[in-house]
Regions:
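Generic beta-strand/beta-sheet core signal
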Residues: 17, 51, 75-78, 118-120, ...
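Generic long, charged, amphipathic alpha-helical segments
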Residues: 173-188
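Glycine- and other small-residue-rich loops at beta-strand/loop junctions that grip anionic moieties
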Residues: 25-26, 51-53, 184-188, 209-210
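His/Asp/Glu-rich metal-coordinating catalytic cores
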Residues: 1-109, 128-141, 160-164
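Conserved small/polar residues in nucleotide/adenosyl-binding loops
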Residues: 212-218
């Protein structure tokens, strides 16, 4: 309704993201992800490591809720993850049940079936927590009975880095769950249906924003 009112007033410029302009339909809701993460955690006998963007507060909230529902505690791993979630908690955007969050050093002493590690490194960054786990240079060790969830999309250009991490984790014996084999992430970019809807109600003189010339004509 707010967009429609703006359209009635007249829009000269609408900056539109073209990343998913070639994806038909509408981007699925984030609500679909929580039950999938909870199911994966419930079926894991050992430890769970979830890697996502350190700024994705809602994804971390879903992991915390899923861990709590399965009687597990959560340790935040990675400086940016700890910092961002600390700010989110202070501002009231992240709701953590009492006793669920635990210091990472104490988490390492818990039985594997009682802990979820929420980490950075979903894009294969070499010095991030997940890459160090995969290369066996981190205190967290994964193997059989353990599950690693990559709750993110591949950013173009990071394919080789991410696949390298996934292969290393599988080689260690871990079960690796990612967007290609489970519904553990939805895009934050508007698909074709949403873009068309916005253009129809706003009718702007628009200037699309694009990463590549591939998606620009579609938008």
């Amino acid at each position: 309704r707010a967009f429609a009112r703006l359209g009635e007033e007249g829009i000269d410029l609408f900056m539109a993201d073209s990343t998913n302009a070639e994806v038909p339909g509408f981007t699925p809701t984030e609500r679909n992800i929580g039950p999938v993460i909870e199911d994966v955690i419930s079926r894991t006998k050992g430890k769970v490591v979830v890697a996502s963007f350190s700024s994705h507060v809602h994804r971390v909230q879903q992991v915390i809720d899923a861990a709590a529902a399965n009687g597990r505690r959560v340790a935040l791993m990675g400086r940016s993850m700890v910092r961002n979630m600390g700010i989110a908690s202070e501002l009231g955007y992240l709701n953590v049940p009492q006793g669920v969050l635990i210091d990472h050093k104490k988490a390492l002493k818990l039985p594997d079936d009682q802990i979820v590690f929420m980490s950075t490194g979903s894009q294969g960054e070499p010095m991030a927590v997940l890459s160090r786990i995969a290369s066996k240079t981190h205190a967290i060790e994964v193997g059989e009975d353990d599950t690693v969830i990559l709750a993110s999309s591949l950013i173009p250009g990071n394919e080789n880095s991410v696949f390298r991490v996934i292969n290393a984790l599988i080689k260690l014996g871990a079960n690796v769950v990612h967007k290609a084999n489970a519904n553990v992430h939805v895009s934050g970019h508007a698909a074709a249906g949403e873009l068309l809807y916005c253009y129809n109600i706003l009718q702007p003189r628009q200037v699309p924003v694009s990463y590549t010339h591939l998606t620009l004509p579609t938008n």
